[in-house]
Swiss-Prot record:
This is Putative actin-25. It catalyses: ATP + H2O = ADP + phosphate + H(+). It is found in: Cytoplasm, Cytoskeleton. One of its GO terms (cellular component) is actin cytoskeleton.
Length: 385
């Protein structure tokens, strides 16, 4: 099967959300939580003669309850499930659950047979070699895909903007990365990772709300906190000045209605939460600067002039102006700073994958089943770079 004859499947597995769809499309067909849930209450069958008991997968406490829930269904039933994220800080850590998510993606979300479509998977910039091989192996041996490609998330974000040179700050739910790219080539020695992203900001917002007297303790309630963060937070251009405004008047306060109808009010928490992206520790602006300074002198100008923001944790209003201000203060005065923040940047990685998979010039880069059978999983290091 020639890869250009059928649409490729593009899957961007994030720490929090799985985005999937077809190469050549403008947006993913589906975006669902990257979670797997199993019932907390499971049954036991007891043999009174042998005084023995054993776990029975099919004997659940609730009639009709399944053994496994994935994505939105798992999210809606969090109260009765043990929920796990198979991807931690961008890296797949639970392969059995990851297989379940991929199965769900193919058959329940996209309604396709994976053996009929080439599959492009995204990977974080510092993905371990063993993980790249495992992804390749599972796609060929479990899902029988005819071809596969594993693509760097940072490069895909850059491609989504139409650029081949620039530095990407990709900040999702689990991890933030800077990836400098020059004429399509990743400058690997300058990739930097920051274990500060959306989930950390949600936890911080929860702390701020607790200080204000609002308590959210269960996993389900923490999803409410995430919603508050996403709907009401913004990045202050000048944090100290914004704090003074917030203390002097209620102008910055906003109300938020909880699912039970209760209305809460928050003020400076709105900008104090995403301020964690910039301080008190090494911020995303300093990480971008440090990454650029690890590159050769003669390309730094190009990188400072094409700073691409990508991922859900770059969606806060005000982040572009603040990033411009911070990088201008850090960079040499001769450097012109340009921040590129497409409105659809929450899905930039997936969009870049969709563009790449649909290019006729890309087709020879797929790893075919024949190549895999001949070389094994290590073929991924030779063809996907």
């Amino acid at each position: 099967m020639e890869c250009e004859e059928v649409q490729a499947i593009v899957i961007d597995n994030g720490s929090s959300v799985c985005k999937a769809g077809f190469g050549g499309d403008d947006a993913p067909r589906t975006a669902f939580p990257s979670i797997v849930g199993r019932p907390r209450c499971t049954g036991f069958i007891v043999d009174m003669d042998k005084k023995d008991s054993y776990f029975c997968k099919k004997n659940s406490c609730f009639m009709g309850q399944k053994d496994l829930y994935i994505g939105d269904e798992a999210q809606s039933k969090r109260g009765i499930l043990n929920v796990k994220y198979p991807i931690e800080r961008g890296i797949i850590t639970n392969w059995n659950d990851m297989e379940e998510i991929w199965y769900h993606t193919f058959y329940n979300e996209l309604h396709v047979a994976p053996e009929e479509h080439p599959v492009l998977l995204t990977e974080p910039p510092l993905n371990p070699k063993a993980n790249r091989e495992k992804m390749t192996q599972i796609m060929f041996e479990t899902f029988k895909t005819p071809a596969i490609y594993v693509a760097n998330q940072g490069v895909l974000s850059l491609y989504s903007t139409g650029l081949t040179t620039g530095i990407v700050m990709n900040s999702g739910d689990g991890v933030s990365h800077t990836v400098p790219v020059y004429e399509g080539y990743i400058l690997r020695q300058a990739i930097l990772s920051l274990d500060l992203a959306g989930r950390d900001l949600t936890d911080y917002m929860n702390e701020l709300l607790t200080d204000r007297g609002y308590y959210f303790t269960t996993k389900g309630e923490k999803e409410i906190v995430r919603g508050i963060k996403e709907k009401l937070s913004y990045v202050a251009l000048d944090f100290e000045a914004e704090m003074q405004i917030a203390s002097a008047s209620p102008a910055l306060e906003k109300s938020y209605e909880l699912p039970d109808g209760q209305v809460i009010t928050i003020g400076n928490e709105r900008f104090r939460c995403p301020e964690a992206l910039f301080r008190p520790y090494t911020g995303i602006h300093e990480t971008i600067y440090n990454s650029i300074m690890k590159c050769d002198d003669d390309i730094r100008k190009d990188l400072f002039g094409s700073v691409v923001l990508s991922g859900g944790s770059t969606m806060f209003p005000g982040i572009v102006d603040r990033m411009n201000k911070e990088l201008t203060a850090l960079a040499p005065s001769t450097m012109k700073i340009k921040i590129i923040a497409p409105p659809e940047r929450k899905y930039s990685v997936w969009i870049g994958g969709s563009i790449l998979a649909s290019l006729s010039s890309f087709q020879p880069r797929w790893i075919s089943k024949e190549e895999y059978d001949e070389s094994g999983p290590s073929i991924v290091h030779r063809k996907c770079f």
